[in-house]
Structure formats: C-alpha cells, structure tokens
Amino acid sequence: MLDYTFQWRVVWKRLPDLLEGAILTLELTILSSIIGLLIASILVVWQKSDNSFLRNFTKTWISIARNTPALLQIYMAYFGLGSFGIHISSYVAVLGAIAFNNAGYMTEILRGGFASISKNQNQAAKGLGLNNFQTYMYVIYPQVLKTVFLPMTNQFIWAMMGTSLGIIIGLQELTGMTTFLQSQTFRPFEFYFIAALIYILSLIHI
C-alpha cells in the first residue's frame, strides 16, 4: 500500500510563487522567440548573400546552434563569458542562449518557407515598382510566415521547455521555483505535478 498523504494545501499557499516562476518562463519564451525570429529574418537573407563573410557567418551560427546542446550554450553564455570578465545574470544568459538557439533553427525553417514561394512573385513585385526591400517585407515575408507557422509553433514549444535548463545556473523560472519550493516543504510530488499542469495548460492550445 502507498504510505503517502497528499497535502495540496501546502501547494496552494505557495501558488503565488509558482505563478511567479511561470510568468518568468513565459516571459523568457516570448522574448527569446521574438529575438530569435528577428535574427533569423536577417540570417536567412545573408544565407544567399553575395558576400562570402555573411554566408559563412550564417552557416557557422546555424551549425553551432543545431549541433551543440542547449545546456552547453547556456554554460558558454554564463560561465564562458565570465572567463573574459563579462559577467551577466542567469536571466540574460538563458534569454541569450535560447534566442541564439532559436535563431539557428528558425533560419532553416524560414529558408524552407522562402523555397516554397514562387519566383514569379518577385517578378510581379518588381513590375509594380517595388524595390528588393519592399518586396521582401510586404510581399514575400508575410507569405513565408504564414507557410512556416506550424513549424514555428513547435520551436516556441521547444523554447518554453528550454527555459527549464535555467535551473542549472540558479534561475527560478517555473522548474527552478518548483524545485526550490519542494526542497523547502518536502512535497515533491504535489509541486512537480502542479508545475507539469501549468506547462501543459500554457501550451495545450498551441
């Protein structure tokens, strides 16, 4: 027989702290996704640039982002930069690392979206007198975003999961706060169960 007495009232009393961690998680997820998308929107253009430096820079970024663990990227941001006297908070380290990772993956997602757009649209836009920037921003890019919406939502979900790695460097996002609270109250099941529900409810409609 299970000899465990559930004490949900303990969780209820500390629910504001859990929600504080959840808000931090959501904030990091949204910001890292926006920053990642903005960077990716530039990198995807540089991929086809005539400038070899820009092409190689983009290739290197994508390679590092996709072929190294996200945890290592966080370590490099937090501890690696510290070795050179650049000390940043755990919040900035996680935000920067997740945004860096997002940018690498989103660049490839956008590249696939651009490949699906007919070249005739470029010609039509030029026929209307639009320059390259206007064609990119007002004709091509909106269609690409619509095409890649589903893959981008998957990346958003990954970003939220990735923020939990912040616990390693002391960030009290949802997972970090949950671990801290259960260590104080010795109610691991209740706290982790509620944390899991918060994650699920945050992402279930995406």
Question: Residue spans of the language-model regions?
Answer:
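Transmembrane alpha-helices and adjacent helix-loop boundaries
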Residues: 1-204
